[in-house]
Amino acid sequence: MVGGGAIGCESGYFFASEWGAQVDILEMRDDVCKDSGMSQRMALIPRMKKAGMGTYCSVQVQEITDNGVKYLDKDGVEQFDQADLVLYCCGSRSNDDEVKALEGVCPHFVVTGDGKRARTVKEATYEGFCAAMDIL
């Protein structure tokens, strides 16, 4: 898994615990799950360890190849993590093409969630709830 945020960690845990896959997380920040709440981190990280997942933090991915990932470890030493499959779970941004296409279609138009900016499911759901309450 390239990316150790909530999505990368949760997806990796699923593959490790349900399918028995050997999962390594490569994260550029100094820890995994930093975009998760404390209770989620306290529940998920021990389960990730129990499932045998490897976590490599403070790394810089250099290249994704046909058989794995080249990266620089926290000391700047080039490493290679062999993998049959690499999931890229990082760097999200808003895609506003659909928002632009819908502008002017109706008199009152509210943009929420990832249409506005990339965010977590929790944040997007709350924003959608607030927009719905404004209608009422």
Please give the residue ranges for each predicted region.
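Hydrophobic Val/Ile/Leu positions in short beta-strands of Rossmann-like dinucleotide-binding domains
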Residues: 1-2, 25
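A conserved FAD-binding loop/helix module that cradles the flavin
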Residues: 7-15, 31-41, 103-104, 109-136
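A Rossmann-like FAD-binding core segment of flavoenzymes
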Residues: 9, 17-101
